Amino acid sequence: MRTWVCLVASYIFYGWWDWRFLSLIVFSTVMDWWFGLWITYHDAPEETRDRCENGSPGLRFFGRLTRWAHGLQLQRRTILVFSMVMNLGFLGFFKYFGFFADNLAALIREMGMTPSWTTLHIILPVGISFYTFQSMSYTIDVYRRELSWEPSLLKFATFIALFPQLVAGPIVRAADFLYQMSEDKRFDWNRWNSGMGRVLWGFFKKIAIADSIAPFVDQC
């Protein structure tokens, strides 16, 4: 239940800015999770197949899809390349396509010609750099056999979309996060008091110290 709450809250938070980009992060999440499954299937096909068949209906579906894809006889490295091309392709299109297209059009106009295309004003999805590299790091770690494939798409999606770090970072490695979602978390007053103490101390330094000396620093 806790994981569902975190995931739904994260998607609401992300979609509040522009719901159209929810499809992008969901698609990237599902594909990279499946690429991790596909890579793992190469190493242990029988164990992975049994794990999928004994799982949820969604896991059984992706298990059968992976068995079909495995018949294509693609190498593990090729699957990793698929993942990287997809992720970097999305990132490059949304973040850099408009920049290069506008500059190329300006250069052509300086040469006395008229560009034959209309430059696109592409909106940059919030946090695309963070969740792209975070998702890629998972696939790369699975490929290097430094991390086991995560059988729960729910946990993996929460790892990618968790709203506290989605739009401002830092980029979190799957090995440092996913195992925590399986731990039994209990409310702890000592941790609460310690955390609130840090928050209040930060407010004090910002309001009482930083804001007070800011006018003098600006004049220097």
Regions found by a protein language model. Give the residues of each.
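Membrane-embedded transmembrane alpha-helical bundles that form the catalytic cores
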Residues: 1-220
